[in-house]
C-alpha cells in the first residue's frame, strides 16, 4: 500500500461535478419535441371546410367565404402582439397551455356550434393558437446553451413537420379507407388535443426568457459601481443615470439596433419579402379548401382528398426547406432574381388554381397547391438565414415579430377589401384571380430590382473606380512588369509571392540604356524621364505590402504571402511608384 502524501494528492485533478443542464437537456428536448408532435395530430383539420359546407353544419359557401373565414385575419391581428409579449413575460409554458386550451375550444365549437357567430368565435380561438406558435419555437432555446441552438431548432422543426404530415395522412386514411365521417374525425381530433393539453401541464418552466426575464440587473449595478470608482461625482449622479438607463436599456437598445439594421440591403429585401409574400401565401392557404369544394362539390366524403394534398405539400415543403440549406450563390447579387423567379412561379400556380373548373381536374388543383406551398417553404429558411445572420438573438426575434405583424396588417387589409361582406365580398374564384395578379405584380417589382442591380454592376465593371492621375490598365501593368524582367535574367520572369526581395545589384541592372528602349516601346513609360524612372525603379530592401491589406498587421512576410496583388507586383519592386489597394486597384503614391 503506497502512503498518500500532500504532493501526490495535489497532482490528482479534481473532476467537476456533472452539470444538471447537461444531464437533463436531452430529456427536456425530447419531451418538448414529443409535445410538439402530438399537438399537431388533428386529423380533422384538413376537412373542416367540407364539414362546414356538408349536411352536418349546412353553411353556404358565401357564409364560409365572406363571413366566417375573414374573422381569422382580424382576430389574428388583434391577438398577435399581446400573445407575443405574454409569451416572453410568462416564460412560455403558460402560453403553450393557453394554446392547447384554445385548440380544445376550437373543436368544441366546431362540434357543438350551429350558427355563424359560433363559427366566428371558433376562428377567434384558432387565431390564438396561431399566435401562440411563437411560444413553442422560442421555448426550446431556453432549455439549452447557445452552442446547441442549431441542433435543437432542427429537432423541434422536424417534430412539427412530422406531426403535420402524420395528421394529414391519418385523416385521409380514416376518411378514404375507414369511411369515417367528418364528425367522427373531429371527435378523434378533440381526443388528441386533450392529450396534448395534459402533456403541456408537465412542461418545465424556464427561469429566463429573451426580453423580460433577463439577468441584467447585476451587470448594470456592477457597471455603475465600477464607473463611480473610476469617475466619482457629487451624489452619485453617474450611477443613478446608469441605473435609470438599465431600466429601459432593452427596448431603447433594440430599437436603435433595429434602426441601424434597416440600412442593410439584404435585411430590407428579405423583410419586404416576408411581409408581402407571406401575406399572399396565407391568403391562398386560408381559402384553397373552399376553392377545392367549388371545383368538386361532392357529397361523398371518400372522394375528398384534402388530407392527401396537405400531406404532400408538407412533405415537399420539408424537402425544399432542407435543400435550401445547400444553395450556394452570391446572395447580394442574385437574391432579387431568385425571389422574382419563385414569385412568378407562384403567380402562375395561383392562376391555374383560379381557372380550374371541371371536377375531374381537382387533382390539378391539388398539384398546383402542393407546388405553391413547396416553393414558399423553399424561401423561408433562406429568408430566415439572411435576416438572422447578422443580428443578435433578441434583435432577431424582434425583427421576425415586426415582419409578421406587418404581414398580418397587409393580409387583413386585403381580406377586408376582397373577401369581407362589408367590402367587395368576392366569390372565392375571383379572389384567386386577384391573388395571382398580386403575385405577378410582386414578381415584376423584384425583376425590375434585379435588372437595376445588374445595370449598376455592369456600369461598375466598365468604369472601375481609379484615381484621376492613373490611366493604367491591368494589361499595361503586366507589360511593364514583363519589361522589367527582360532586363535581368536573374529575375526569371515574375516573382512568386514567397520570393525574397531583389538585391541592389539586380535592381540597378534594370536601369540603363535598355530603359530608354522600354520607354520608347511603352507609351506609359515614355511619359517619365529617365532619372525619374530610375528614382521610381529604385529597389527597396523590404517588401512593400499592399496598403490596407489585412495581413499587413502580422508583418511584411505574412502580407506578401496572402496579398493577391503580388502576382502582378513582385515583392521588393516598387513598380513606377505604384501601390496596390484591394478596393481601388493601383494608386500612384508619388502624387
Curated annotation (Swiss-Prot):
<dbReference type="GO" id="GO:0015711">
    <property type="term" value="P:organic anion transport"/>
</dbReference>
<keyword id="KW-0050">Antiport</keyword>
<dbReference type="GO" id="GO:0042910">
    <property type="term" value="F:xenobiotic transmembrane transporter activity"/>
</dbReference>
<feature type="topological domain" description="Extracellular">
    <location>
        <begin position="423"/>
        <end position="430"/>
    </location>
</feature>
<feature type="topological domain" description="Extracellular">
    <location>
        <begin position="179"/>
        <end position="183"/>
    </location>
</feature>
<feature type="binding site">
    <location>
        <position position="281"/>
    </location>
    <ligand>
        <name>folate</name>
    </ligand>
</feature>
<dbReference type="GO" id="GO:0015884">
    <property type="term" value="P:folic acid transport"/>
</dbReference>
<dbReference type="GO" id="GO:0008514">
    <property type="term" value="F:organic anion transmembrane transporter activity"/>
</dbReference>
<dbReference type="GO" id="GO:0046655">
    <property type="term" value="P:folic acid metabolic process"/>
</dbReference>
<feature type="binding site">
    <location>
        <position position="381"/>
    </location>
    <ligand>
        <name>2',3'-cGAMP</name>
    </ligand>
</feature>
<feature type="modified residue" description="Phosphoserine">
    <location>
        <position position="225"/>
    </location>
</feature>
<feature type="topological domain" description="Extracellular">
    <location>
        <begin position="293"/>
        <end position="304"/>
    </location>
</feature>
<feature type="binding site">
    <location>
        <position position="286"/>
    </location>
    <ligand>
        <name>folate</name>
    </ligand>
</feature>
<dbReference type="GO" id="GO:0016323">
    <property type="term" value="C:basolateral plasma membrane"/>
</dbReference>
<feature type="transmembrane region" description="Helical; Name=3">
    <location>
        <begin position="92"/>
        <end position="112"/>
    </location>
</feature>
<feature type="modified residue" description="Phosphoserine">
    <location>
        <position position="5"/>
    </location>
</feature>
<feature type="transmembrane region" description="Helical; Name=8">
    <location>
        <begin position="305"/>
        <end position="327"/>
    </location>
</feature>
<feature type="binding site">
    <location>
        <position position="384"/>
    </location>
    <ligand>
        <name>2',3'-cGAMP</name>
    </ligand>
</feature>
<keyword id="KW-0225">Disease variant</keyword>
<comment type="similarity">
    <text>Belongs to the reduced folate carrier (RFC) transporter (TC 2.A.48) family.</text>
</comment>
<feature type="binding site">
    <location>
        <position position="149"/>
    </location>
    <ligand>
        <name>2',3'-cGAMP</name>
    </ligand>
</feature>
<feature type="binding site">
    <location>
        <position position="137"/>
    </location>
    <ligand>
        <name>2',3'-cGAMP</name>
    </ligand>
</feature>
<feature type="topological domain" description="Cytoplasmic">
    <location>
        <begin position="456"/>
        <end position="591"/>
    </location>
</feature>
<dbReference type="GO" id="GO:0051958">
    <property type="term" value="P:methotrexate transport"/>
</dbReference>
<dbReference type="GO" id="GO:1904447">
    <property type="term" value="P:folate import across plasma membrane"/>
</dbReference>
<dbReference type="GO" id="GO:0008517">
    <property type="term" value="F:folic acid transmembrane transporter activity"/>
</dbReference>
<feature type="glycosylation site" description="N-linked (GlcNAc...) asparagine">
    <location>
        <position position="58"/>
    </location>
</feature>
<dbReference type="GO" id="GO:0098838">
    <property type="term" value="P:folate transmembrane transport"/>
</dbReference>
<feature type="region of interest" description="Required for substrate-binding">
    <location>
        <begin position="407"/>
        <end position="419"/>
    </location>
</feature>
<feature type="topological domain" description="Cytoplasmic">
    <location>
        <begin position="203"/>
        <end position="266"/>
    </location>
</feature>
<dbReference type="GO" id="GO:0015350">
    <property type="term" value="F:methotrexate transmembrane transporter activity"/>
</dbReference>
<feature type="binding site">
    <location>
        <position position="373"/>
    </location>
    <ligand>
        <name>folate</name>
    </ligand>
</feature>
<dbReference type="GO" id="GO:0140360">
    <property type="term" value="F:cyclic-GMP-AMP transmembrane transporter activity"/>
</dbReference>
<feature type="transmembrane region" description="Helical; Name=4">
    <location>
        <begin position="117"/>
        <end position="139"/>
    </location>
</feature>
<dbReference type="GO" id="GO:0009636">
    <property type="term" value="P:response to toxic substance"/>
</dbReference>
<dbReference type="GO" id="GO:0006855">
    <property type="term" value="P:xenobiotic transmembrane transport"/>
</dbReference>
<feature type="modified residue" description="Phosphoserine">
    <location>
        <position position="503"/>
    </location>
</feature>
<feature type="transmembrane region" description="Helical; Name=2">
    <location>
        <begin position="65"/>
        <end position="87"/>
    </location>
</feature>
<feature type="binding site">
    <location>
        <position position="396"/>
    </location>
    <ligand>
        <name>2',3'-cGAMP</name>
    </ligand>
</feature>
<feature type="binding site">
    <location>
        <position position="400"/>
    </location>
    <ligand>
        <name>2',3'-cGAMP</name>
    </ligand>
</feature>
<feature type="binding site">
    <location>
        <position position="377"/>
    </location>
    <ligand>
        <name>2',3'-cGAMP</name>
    </ligand>
</feature>
<feature type="transmembrane region" description="Helical; Name=6">
    <location>
        <begin position="184"/>
        <end position="202"/>
    </location>
</feature>
Amino acid at each position: 500500500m503506497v502512503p498518500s502524501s500532500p504532493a501526490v494528492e495535489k497532482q490528482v485533478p479534481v473532476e467537476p461535478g456533472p452539470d444538471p443542464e447537461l444531464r437533463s437537456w436531452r430529456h427536456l428536448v425530447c419531451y418538448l419535441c414529443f409535445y410538439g408532435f402530438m399537438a399537431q395530430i388533428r386529423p380533422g383539420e384538413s376537412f373542416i371546410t367540407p364539414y362546414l359546407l356538408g349536411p352536418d353544419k349546412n353553411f353556404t359557401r358565401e357564409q364560409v367565404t365572406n363571413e366566417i373565414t375573414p374573422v381569422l385575419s382580424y382576430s389574428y391581428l388583434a391577438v398577435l402582439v399581446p400573445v407575443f409579449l405574454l409569451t416572453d413575460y410568462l416564460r412560455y409554458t403558460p402560453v403553450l397551455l393557453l394554446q392547447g386550451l384554445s385548440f380544445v375550444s376550437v373543436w368544441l365549437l366546431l362540434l357543438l356550434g350551429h350558427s355563424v357567430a359560433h363559427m366566428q368565435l371558433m376562428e377567434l380561438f384558432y387565431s390564438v393558437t396561431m399566435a401562440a406558435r411563437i411560444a413553442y419555437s422560442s421555448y426550446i432555446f431556453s432549455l439549452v446553451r447557445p452552442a446547441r441552438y442549431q441542433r435543437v431548432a432542427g429537432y423541434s422543426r422536424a417534430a412539427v413537420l412530422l406531426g403535420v404530415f402524420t395528421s394529414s395522412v391519418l385523416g385521409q386514411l380514416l376518411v378514404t379507407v375507414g369511411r369515417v365521417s367528418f364528425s367522427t374525425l373531429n371527435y378523434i381530433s378533440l381526443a388528441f388535443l386533450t392529450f396534448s393539453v395534459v402533456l403541456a401541464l408537465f412542461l418545465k418552466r424556464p427561469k429566463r426568457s429573451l426580453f423580460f426575464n433577463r439577468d441584467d440587473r447585476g451587470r448594470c449595478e456592477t457597471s455603475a459601481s465600477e464607473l463611480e470608482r473610476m469617475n466619482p461625482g457629487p451624489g452619485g449622479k453617474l450611477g443613478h443615470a446608469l441605473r435609470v438607463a438599465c431600466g429601459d436599456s432593452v427596448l431603447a437598445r433594440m430599437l436603435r439596433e433595429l434602426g441601424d439594421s434597416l440600412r442593410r440591403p439584404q435585411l430590407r429585401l428579405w423583410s419586404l419579402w416576408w411581409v408581402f409574400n407571406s401575406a399572399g401565401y396565407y391568403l391562398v392557404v386560408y381559402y384553397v379548401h373552399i376553392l377545392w369544394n367549388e371545383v368538386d362539390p361532392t357529397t361523398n366524403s371518400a372522394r375528398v382528398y384534402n388530407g392527401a394534398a396537405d400531406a404532400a405539400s408538407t412533405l415537399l415543403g420539408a424537402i425544399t426547406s432542407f435543400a435550401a440549406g445547400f444553395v450556394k450563390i452570391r446572395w447580394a447579387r442574385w437574391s432579387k432574381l431568385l425571389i422574382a423567379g419563385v414569385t412568378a412561379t407562384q403567380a402562375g400556380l395561383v392562376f391555374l388554381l383560379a381557372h380550374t373548373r371541371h371536377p375531374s381536374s381537382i387533382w390539378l388543383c391539388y398539384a398546383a397547391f402542393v407546388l405553391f406551398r413547396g416553393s414558399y417553404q423553399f424561401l423561408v429558411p433562406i429568408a430566415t438565414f439572411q435576416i438572422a445572420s447578422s443580428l443578435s438573438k433578441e434583435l432577431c426575434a424582434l425583427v421576425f415579430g415586426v415582419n409578421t405583424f406587418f404581414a398580418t396588417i397587409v393580409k387583413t387589409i386585403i381580406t377586408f377589401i376582397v373577401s369581407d361582406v362589408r367590402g367587395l365580398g368576392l366569390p372565392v374564384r375571383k379572389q384567386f384571380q386577384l391573388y395571382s395578379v398580386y403575385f405577378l405584380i410582386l414578381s415584376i417589382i423584384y425583376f425590375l430590382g434585379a435588372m437595376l442591380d445588374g445595370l449598376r454592376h455592369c456600369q461598375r465593371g466598365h468604369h472601375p473606380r481609379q484615381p484621376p492621375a492613373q490611366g493604367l490598365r491591368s494589361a499595361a501593368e503586366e507589360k511593364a512588369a514583363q519589361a522589367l524582367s527582360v532586363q535581368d535574367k536573374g529575375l526569371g520572369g515574375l516573382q512568386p509571392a514567397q520570393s525574397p526581395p531583389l538585391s541592389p545589384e539586380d535592381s540597378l541592372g534594370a536601369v540603363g540604356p535598355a530603359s530608354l528602349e522600354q520607354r520608347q516601346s511603352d507609351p506609359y513609360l515614355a511619359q517619365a524621364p529617365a532619372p525619374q524612372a530610375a528614382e521610381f525603379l529604385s529597389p527597396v530592401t523590404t517588401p512593400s505590402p499592399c496598403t490596407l491589406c489585412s495581413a499587413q498587421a502580422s508583418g511584411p512576410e505574412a502580407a506578401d504571402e496572402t496579398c493577391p496583388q503580388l502576382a502582378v507586383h513582385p515583392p521588393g519592386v516598387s513598380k513606377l511608384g505604384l501601390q496596390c489597394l484591394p478596393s481601388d486597384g493601383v494608386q500612384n503614391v508619388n502624387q
